[in-house]
Curated annotation (Swiss-Prot):
Name used for this protein in its record: Cyclic pyranopterin monophosphate synthase
Enzyme class, broadest EC rank: lyase
Domain of life: Bacteria
Pfam family, one: MoaC
UniProt-annotated catalytic positions: 128
Length: 161
């Protein structure tokens, strides 16, 4: 069974020492969903939201979140990200927005938390911009889709039912 890497022998939380690790290309993808009423979704699609371009704002918020992950999650390392991509798409059949993020770097630690932070904050931004119109939007699921690089190898999530 795998050990928790952020807990030392005394059971105390600590930041992992990555100084001896080799630099490798690492990439992670994550997704999040925001489900809403059809009229709320139409307002976003038609560009009629009073606060402006919801997708552009959510995209920038996601990028900022990835770059700020180390400030939000206590034991994350500050990373020199080489790529942050936030893609938003409409799923009208499910009355929701799908957010997919991709983070990449060449470094000593993975970018899973950065990808998840980007997806989460983009979803929260959509909620924030639309809450005056609809307060019962649902955020989720939020999950890691894939990661590559590093000692633990590759990971690919299964399909969500």
């Amino acid at each position: 069974m795998s050990q928790l890497t952020h807990i030392n022998a005394a059971g105390e939380a600590h930041m992992v020492d990555v100084s001896a690790k080799a630099e490798t290309v690492r990439e992670a993808r994550a997704e999040a969903y925001v489900t809403m009423r059809q009229d709320t979704l139409a307002m976003i699609i038609d560009g009629k939201h009073p606060k402006g371009d919801v997708f552009a704002t959510a995209r920038i918020a996601g990028i900022q979140a990835a770059k700020s992950t180390w400030q939000l999650i206590p034991l994350c390392h500050p990373l020199l990200l080489s790529k942050v991509e936030v893609t938003l798409s409409v799923e009208p059949v499910h009355s929701r927005v799908r957010i997919e993020t991709c983070c990449r770097l060449c470094g000593k630690t993975g970018v899973e938390m950065e990808a998840l932070s980007a997806a989460s904050v983009a979803a929260l931004t959509i909620y924030d911009m639309c809450k005056a119109v609809q307060k019962d939007m649902v955020i989720g699921p939020v999950r890691l889709l894939a990661k590559s690089g590093g000692k633990s190898g590759d990971f690919h999530a299964g399909e969500v039912q």
